[in-house]
Amino acid sequence: MFARAVKPHDGIIMFRAFVYDNHINETNWKADRANAAVDFFKDLDGKFDENVVVQIKYGPIDFQVREPVSPLFSTLRNTSTAIELQVTQEYLGQQTHLVYLAPLWKEILDFDLKADDRPSKVKDIVSGERFRRPLGGSAGVVNVGTNSTWLGSHLAMSVGL
């Protein structure tokens, strides 16, 4: 609905794909929370308008310090996607430590999901190149506060730059 309304104005809709709980039974130790977004979105692949980009968190859980790359990147082959990167440091010492995130981002973007046993680096998927999609991109998530530095630290804003 929104995509069609903004299309005449060359508008793009970013649809955030964060699925926190897709009816997973927490008492079942074999339930796969990391696959919840795939379960939710796999049947929607190709059903979004061409001016919609599905924004996917780099990992399937929730910006944990170390987590695998989201399998949703290689699942949505007929839908334009963007990667959502963590800039905020809520899980990385609450901004009481200096954390340089560029190596983490590089590792994620260079990760090869090997879709169909072919090279499928995350950076090639979100650029639109791997699955020949017209759109793609990246987004950063920050927690902006009300103090003089906005992010709680004089260096926090420079971490992602």
Feature annotation, model-predicted:
Residues 2-161:
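Substrate-binding groove of N-acetylhexosamine-processing glycoside hydrolases
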